[in-house]
A protein has these predicted regions:
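Hydrophobic alpha-helical membrane-insertion signals
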Residues: 1-28
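Anion-binding and metal-coordination hotspots
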Residues: 3-4, 63, 70-83, 94-503
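A short, ordered amphipathic alpha-helix with a cationic face
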Residues: 3-7, 51-52, 89
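Generic alpha-helical segment signature
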Residues: 10, 23, 55, 113, ...
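Basic, short loop/linker segments at the boundary and entry of helix-turn-helix/winged-helix-like folds
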Residues: 22-64, 432, 437
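A short secondary-structure junction motif
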Residues: 36-41, 84, 88, 471
């Protein structure tokens, strides 16, 4: 009735672990490809002296295969190395502990894993799995391994320093009025040059001036109190400013994480959480390039992302396909300078295709512009005079030129109520260089080739993020610090690509 079994039966010969693993198992793909790539840079991170270490090729294989199996904890990886036949086959029946696995992941792979990732992608290109000619780029936000209530805000630091400067000025003026003499400095410290040393020196001068003078006891006590606390607070704000490094916020748990509004907002309250902004470029749903950014927006990440692509492969993609989050003047010109053909949507691209937008003569985008005479004409046909040119500087230091035009006489115009509601004449702002770029880009996006790339992009790059977040359950990083986050995402990208090969 039942098949017999014996748990304690001994075999005549020791079994080979590979005999129990199917030939089409993903672990064989991981083993085969990583065995073929050059890991010389990784070997150089080891010293020939001291006790022998676990082989870095074997350690890399078990980490990549663990990420392929959605195993991200070093303790769970150690457990699988002891109990899972596939991990035992990769390690050759040796079992590195979780500390060894974590040290290898966090320290040994630093600054070399990106090169290993590029080597694997080049191998896949040579095998015909993927091409570097077309790159679909997109980004997403992922939570950092940090508590959501450990925020430090840049504006809050600015406010507190300003408050100290204002109170110091009040104390200074009081000391001058009581002592009936001018203090050595004509004025206290402004916000721009406030430092702990200058504040300490100023408070010492005030304290010396108030000694032996019939002054308010509360004011004297306050001076003695802030003489101890303010320099210490300013040193704290100074160190926090260095950590911010131009950002608006950071987390005390992970100083490199920035507070962002995540796409997964289960409470629907727009709560900010510490996280990173990974950017990837894909082709045929293989990840070609990745970068990790600390800013929430995608627009400013494009030049750095493409520079990284060039550093990995010595070339830029022939075609770059992106959504409207990357459609800025800076990015279009960057791609043009480096010979990249762009199919990048811009803001209002889809809105422009609607009949209501095209047929509305009162929208500034539909105003007629004569390039030869530099004339902008309103719906009534009146020529608008050019007022001035303004400059705008982006976060990356890119300079935009904005031209301002003003209508000559809106008073008594029969179309005024439909044209604008301001009391003065209507003013229109135009970026002429961006306007020309948009005209060229619109023509490409509406062509047959543009329609092909626009329909291909969501299936390519957005499907990868959906796979990583939902099928691989990777919605939050498990390591802290920008360098370690880059290592973890590289392992995830390598594992994802090799899983695609295995499938």
């Amino acid at each position: 009735m039942f098949k017999s079994y014996t748990s304690n039966d001994n075999l005549l010969l020791p079994p080979c672990l590979g005999d129990f693993i199917p030939q089409n198992d993903p672990v064989r793909v991981v083993h085969r490809i990583i065995e073929q790539i050059n890991l010389e840079k990784l070997y150089r991170r080891y010293s020939p002296q001291g006790c022998s270490a676990y082989h870095p090729r074997m350690m890399l294989q078990i980490l990549v295969y663990a990420y392929l199996r959605n195993i991200y904890s070093s303790r769970r990886i150690e457990e699988f190395c002891r109990n899972d036949i596939r991990f035992m086959w990769l390690t050759g029946n040796v079992t590195p502990d979780h500390n060894t696995i974590n040290r290898f992941r966090s320290s040994r792979l630093k600054d070399v894993l990106k090169t290993i990732f590029a080597t694997i992608v080049k191998f896949l290109v040579a095998e015909g799995f993927v091409s570097l000619d077309v790159a679909c780029t997109d980004g997403t936000k992922m939570e950092a391994d940090a508590n959501r209530y450990t925020f430090v805000w840049g504006k809050s630091i600015h406010t507190r320093i300003s408050r100290i400067a204002e109170q110091l000025e009040e104390i200074w003026q009081y000391a001058e009025s009581v002592t009936k003499q001018e203090l050595r400095d004509s004025a206290p410290i402004t916000y721009q040059d406030i430092t702990p040393e200058k504040v300490e020196k100023a408070l010492c001068q005030i304290d010396d001036a108030l000694n032996g003078v019939d002054a308010d006891r509360k004011m004297k006590a306050k001076v003695r109190r802030v003489r101890k606390s303010w320099p210490e607070q300013l040193r704290k704000y100074e160190s926090q400013g260095k950590i911010l490094d131009g950002r608006n916020s950071y987390s005390k748990t992970d100083n490199d994480a920035t507070f962002m509004r995540m796409k997964e907002d289960h409470m629907r309250n727009g709560q900010l959480k510490p996280g990173y902004n990974p950017q990837i470029s894909t082709n045929r749903q293989f990840i070609l390039n990745y970068t990790i950014h600390q800013c929430a927006g995608d627009t400013s990440t494009y030049p750095l992302h493409m520079d990284n692509f060039h550093s990995l492969y010595g070339r830029y993609p022939d075609v770059s396909v992106c959504d409207a989050g990357y459609g800025s003047e800076e990015n279009y010109l960057y791609a043009f300078r480096h010979g990249i053909e762009t199919f990048i949507k811009y803001n209002n691209f889809h809105k422009e295709q609607k009949r209501n937008f095209r047929n509305d003569p009162f929208l500034s985008a539909n105003f007629y512009y004569n390039e030869e005479t530099d004339g902008m004409y309103c719906p009534m046909g009146q020529r608008m005079e050019r007022l001035s040119d303004a400059r705008r500087i982006t976060d990356n230091g890119f300079v935009q030129t904005i031209s301002r035009y003003r209508a000559r006489n809106c008073k008594g115009c029969p179309l005024r109520c439909r044209c604008h509601r301001s009391r003065s004449e209507r003013i229109v702002q135009v970026n002429h260089r961006l306007r020309k770029i948009k005209e060229r880009e619109r023509e490409k996006l509406l062509s047959d080739e543009g329609l092909k790339y626009r329909s291909q992009r969501p299936q390519d790059v957005e499907a990868v993020f959906g796979n990583l977040k939902n099928n691989k359950h990777f919605k939050r990083f498990h390591l802290r610090g920008l360098k370690k986050v880059e290592i973890e995402f590289a392992l995830l990208a390598i594992a994802y690509n090799l899983a695609k090969v295995a499938s």
